[in-house]
Amino acid sequence: MENRFKGRTAFVTGGSRGIGKAIVEQFAQEGANVAIVDLDQEALTKTEAELKEKGYPVYAKLASVTNQEEIALAMKEVNEAFGSIDILVNNAGVTRDNMLFKMTDEDWTTVIDVHLKGAFYTARAAQEYMTKKKYGRIINISSTSALGNRGQSNYSTAKAGLQGFTKTLAIEIGKFGITVNAVAPGFIETDMTKATAARIGVSFDDLIGNAVAQIPVARSGKPKDISNAILFFADEKSSFVSGQVLYVAGGPVN
């Protein structure tokens, strides 16, 4: 495996399952030091053990992206452990789907806080280290839901907000050698989409089948499809690509 990230440190939020875990694993396989923060202790411990068993340098910490003190401490510890924070992937996410008239204040606030406040806290903490090094890569995970999706007014708003956040940061901190981009997944087979199937009362296979019927490449997405896109933006060779949103959805989106 090519060690294109050797000597680099990738800090991934929500990195113990699904898309996040695929991102962490691919960074590790390609030579990066990896740092994971997550709220799922069981998954975090399992992922950390798997990576260490393979000899990969890894930092794992139970922390909430909505707690700026926890994030600041994690960043400090990662910098002390590995000597830099070069890549930030804002992957942590949550859904609380419901129609507007049924959506509670907590449903709204939880989703907005995890995605937007979380990305704000992590990016603000990371840029302190990146600007000193005159190098950095920040990649935010948006979604095709940013374009609007029934029953997801909170999630759609958060994911659209991340796109605006991405473009603004690209303008603000580009002069410090930092690029900021976003990846917007379409239908990806994860625990989150399994939960969606359960919520609407259909089998996961049926949910996949319905999604695939509308995807031009005639297949569903896998976490590796997203990690491939993330690593493209994280690569040193992508230094002239910033402020972009890449839809990884198996076809054009409207």
Which positions does each model-derived feature cover?
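Conserved glycine-rich cofactor-binding loop
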Residues: 16-17
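The beta1-alpha1 cofactor-binding region of Rossmann-like NAD(H)/NADP(H)-dependent oxidoreductases
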Residues: 41-42, 62-73, 105, 225
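Conserved mid-core segment of classical short-chain dehydrogenase/reductases
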Residues: 72, 95-109, 132, 151-154, ...
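Substrate-binding pocket helix/loop in short-chain dehydrogenase/reductase
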Residues: 99-100, 107-112, 138, 207, ...
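Active-site helix of classical SDR
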Residues: 123, 158, 166
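Alpha-helical segment proximal to the catalytic Tyr-Lys
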Residues: 128, 171-175, 239
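Short C-terminal tail/terminal secondary-structure segment
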Residues: 231, 242-254
